[in-house]
């Protein structure tokens, strides 16, 4: 087990994302995790990400700490 503090996180450019800051909390490079990774993203109003669920075999989980988030599927349906 490895403890990571917020001050240790480093921002990175997330492909297909805009108006946001992405930081990886746990993953291969950060803590040695091999089968998953955990990120922390902060989106500005109007920020977002392109639809990329078919190109990525990883499942995604979003937990909104503050504000709200709209997800649109490939057909444009909002959730």
Regions found by a protein language model. Name each.
Residues 1-37:
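A short, N-terminal "cap"/entry segment at the start of jelly-roll beta-barrel domains
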Residues 3, 22, 38-42, 61, ...:
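Conserved hydrophobic/aromatic beta-strand scaffold that supports enzyme active sites
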Residues 6-9, 40, 44, 58, ...:
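Generic detector of leucine side chains in alpha-helical contexts
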Residues 19, 39, 46, 67-69:
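Glycine-centered flexibility sites
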Residues 24-28, 39-56:
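Conserved short histidine dyad/triad with adjacent acidic residue
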Residues 48-79:
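A short beta-strand-loop-beta hairpin characteristic of the jelly-roll/cupin
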């Amino acid at each position: 087990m490895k403890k990571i503090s917020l001050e240790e996180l480093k921002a990175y450019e997330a492909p297909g994302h805009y108006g946001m800051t992405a930081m990886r909390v746990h993953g291969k490079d950060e803590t040695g995790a091999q089968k998953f990774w955990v990120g922390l993203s902060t989106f500005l109003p109007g920020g977002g990400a392109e639809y990329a669920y078919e190109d990525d075999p990883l499942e995604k989980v979003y937990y909104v700490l503050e504000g709200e988030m709209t997800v649109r599927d490939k057909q444009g349906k909002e959730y």
